[in-house]
Every structure is written in C-alpha cells, then in structure tokens.
Amino acid sequence: MINLTIVLAVEEVAEKGGLFDINATLPLMAIQFLLLAFVLDKIFYKPLGKAIDSRADYIRENQVKAKERLAKAKQLAEQYEQEFAQTRQKSQVVIVAAQAEAEKIAATKVAVAQKEAQVKREQAAQEIEKQKEVALEQLEEQVDSLSRQILEKLLGPELVR
C-alpha cells in the first residue's frame, strides 16, 4: 500500500508538471541559455576582460617604470652624495691650504713688520745717541763757558786767561 501511494503521488506530480518536464520547452530554454551566454560573452565579458587586461597591463607597465625611476633616483642620489663627499673633501683641502697660505703670509708680514720696527728702533736709538752727543757737546761748551764765567767772577778776568 505504501508503494501504491508513492506511485500515485509520482503520477500526480508528473501530470501537473514537475521540476523537469521533458517537453519542447527544455531544448528552447537550453537554446535561450546558450544564446544569452553567447551574447553576454560578446557584449559584456570579452570587453570587460579586455578592459581589465589592459588596465592590468597599464598598472604593470607603470610599476615597472616606477621601479626603474626609483632605481635611477637612488642611483642619482648615491652619485650626488659621492660627489658631495668628494667636493667636501676637496673644499677641506682647499681651506687647509688657504689657511696655511694665510698663516704663511701673516708670518711673513709679521716678520717684515718686526724687521721694520727693529730698523726704526735702531734708527731712533742712533738718533737719540746723536742728539745725546750733541747735547753733551753743547753742555760741555756751556760748562766751559760757565766755568770761565764763574772763575772770572771769583778770581777776576785777568787771572783766568
């Protein structure tokens, strides 16, 4: 009896139309599905795929270019840093040389100035010595003259000569 109920239930379902009715609509639905898939492929999926592929290629190319630019920028930065270090070393050498030259020039000028000062000091000492001798000679003359005057006053003018 249970078997009979199942058979009757299946027959009723088959008569009313079930999930898969095998009739002319099934191949029509399959053809519609294939046609829709074909149209979507031509109109939507291929252009979308091409757009996605071209965008991916564009991004990939830009990434490669960016990596190249970054590598070039790093290389240039390293090169500039090396050149800057070399320039700094050269400038330090030039500064040291200039300082040495300036010290040499200053030492030479100081030596020349000291020699000039020594010469002027010696000239001044000679001048002072000459003036001293002249003053002493004048004083001797004055002393001689004053001594005679004193003697003349004390002894009289007749005895002094």
UniProtKB/Swiss-Prot annotation:
GO terms for molecular function: proton-transporting ATP synthase activity, rotational mechanism; proton-transporting ATPase activity, rotational mechanism. The chain crosses the membrane at residues 26-45. The keyword Iron-sulfur does not apply. Keywords: ATP synthesis, CF(0), Hydrogen ion transport, Ion transport, Membrane, Thylakoid, Transmembrane, Transmembrane helix, Transport. It holds the Pfam family ATP-synt_B. It is found in: Cellular thylakoid membrane. InterPro entries: ATP_synth_b (IPR034679), ATP_synth_b/b'su_bac/chlpt (IPR002146), ATP_synthase_B_chain (IPR050059). One of its GO terms (cellular component) is proton-transporting ATP synthase complex. It is a single-pass membrane protein. Disulfide bonds: none annotated. Its main location: membrane. F-type ATPases have 2 components, F(1) - the catalytic core - and F(0) - the membrane proton channel. F(1) has five subunits: alpha(3), beta(3), gamma(1), delta(1), epsilon(1). F(0) has four main subunits: a(1), b(1), b'(1) and c(10-14). The alpha and beta chains form an alternating ring which encloses part of the gamma chain. F(1) is attached to F(0) by a central stalk formed by the gamma and epsilon chains, while a peripheral stalk is formed by the delta, b and b' chains. F(1)F(0) ATP synthase produces ATP from ADP in the presence of a proton or sodium gradient. F-type ATPases consist of two structural domains, F(1) containing the extramembraneous catalytic core and F(0) containing the membrane proton channel, linked together by a central stalk and a peripheral stalk. During catalysis, ATP synthesis in the catalytic domain of F(1) is coupled via a rotary mechanism of the central stalk subunits to proton translocation. Belongs to the ATPase B chain family. This is ATP synthase subunit b'. It comes from Trichodesmium erythraeum (strain IMS101).
